[in-house]
Amino acid sequence: MGIGKTTALRSLCGSLMSSSDVRNLDLAAHSKELTTVGTEFGEIDLGGGEVVQICGCPGQERFSFVRQWVLSVSLGVFIMVDMNAPTSLGETLHILEEIRQLPTSPVTLVLSARPATTEQIETFAQGVYSAGYGVVPVLEADPRERAQLLDAMGVLVSMLSLQSENS
């Protein structure tokens, strides 16, 4: 909760986005005013009539059914984490396991949405690898910075392109 998923969608899509934010009633878990309670959709206009459709879903476990549906229809996925949170690796491994269970797994990239040291990122990536999920790229991207998010999307598109060449 509060990693910046809605902010990232707004940064990428601007007004071409539908939000599912409501007033946060779980102030004990997080002090933010609003929280996401459903899937959010947006489009990035690439020009020339081409668009990329993106969606985001709440991270809380009580919304796992929403996340599982989104994962099942996705080609590529960003898992947004705060490397400073002690639970970030475990939560990421949980989502990676959900992805592994799908009939067709989307290409996956981890976004460190809060400042992290190179050592933290390398330790995190090694933890993912050691848990048996292979090499999952880990990039830093501020959810408020459209250019950083577009760079991360470029990496995801490259991964999708490589995947289609190898299949």
Model-derived features: positions:
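Conserved G1/Walker A P-loop phosphate-binding module
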Residues: 1-33, 42-45
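Loop/turn-to-beta-strand initiation segments
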Residues: 49-52, 75-76, 105-108
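Inter-motif core of Ras-like GTPase G domains
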Residues: 62-85, 98-102
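Canonical P-loop GTPase G-domain recognition
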Residues: 115-167
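Short secondary-structure boundary/capping elements
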Residues: 36, 58-63, 87-91, 120
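Short, flexible loop segments at the rims of nucleotide/cofactor-binding pockets, characterized by
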Residues: 30-31, 53-58, 85-88
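Conserved C-terminal guanine-recognition region of P-loop GTPase G domains, centered on the G4
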Residues: 81-134
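Switch II (G3) loop of P-loop NTPases
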Residues: 46-64
